[in-house]
């Protein structure tokens, strides 16, 4: 069965498409995909892969700002990547990531994401690099360190060039998980 790819901004998705994407994510994360997690994946570009059984895979890239060495980098942040259970290990996750990476490479200074141990295998195989330095956020109370995020942030160097792990990353603030 042929798999159809659709690339669209959140604003161009029909309500039914958004509901199907949310249902896929809820199922893929065993109900551990919160309203804040969903919100983090909106407002950017979505990759949707459809097969004969419906929505098989999804991922999105949204704009964030990350400061490094005093410069705020326009960052394509990967969110909400999932593959339907019966379609896993068929290359669909790689197809989603290839499209997201194409968007990142053409439109952003840097790509970034936070990965689970299981997801990290996919990202490492695709050339993403685990960030070895400190992670901070610009919170309402000022810059705060996020030691729990360290080791879980992955980067795709782009137009910004290589980053120095001796210097911290400072993420813009958002509700819920900052990274």
Q: Could you describe each region identified by the protein language model?
A:
Residues 129-155:
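Conserved catalytic-core motifs of GNAT/GCN5-like acyltransferases
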Residues 112-122, 137:
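Conserved beta-strand-loop-alpha-helix junction that forms the acyl-donor binding cleft
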Residues 102-116:
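Conserved GNAT acetyl-CoA-binding A-motif
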Residues 86-99:
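Conserved acetyl-CoA pyrophosphate-binding loop and the N-cap/start of the following alpha-helix
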Residues 1-15, 168-178:
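Conserved N-terminal entry element of GNAT/NAT acetyltransferase domains
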Residues 21, 123-124, 128:
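Conserved active-site tyrosine of GNAT-family acetyltransferases
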């Amino acid at each position: 069965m042929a798999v159809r790819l659709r690339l669209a901004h959140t604003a161009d998705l029909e309500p039914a498409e958004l509901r199907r994407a949310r249902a896929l994510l809820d199922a893929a994360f065993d109900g551990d995909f919160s309203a804040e997690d969903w919100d983090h994946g909106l407002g950017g570009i979505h990759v949707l892969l459809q097969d004969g059984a419906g929505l098989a895979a999804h991922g999105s890239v949204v704009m964030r700002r990350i400061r490094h060495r005093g410069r705020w980098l326009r960052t394509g942040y990967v969110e909400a990547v999932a593959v339907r259970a019966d379609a896993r290990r068929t290359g669909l996750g790689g197809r989603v990531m290839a499209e997201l990476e194409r968007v990142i490479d053409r439109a952003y200074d840097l790509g970034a994401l936070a990965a689970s141990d299981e997801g990290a295998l996919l990202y490492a195989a695709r050339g993403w690099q685990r960030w070895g330095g400190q992670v901070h956020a610009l919170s309402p109370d000022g810059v705060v360190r996020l030691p729990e995020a360290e080791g879980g942030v992955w980067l795709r160097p782009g137009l910004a060039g290589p980053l120095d792990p001796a210097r911290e990353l400072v993420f813009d603030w958002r509700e819920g998980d900052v990274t």
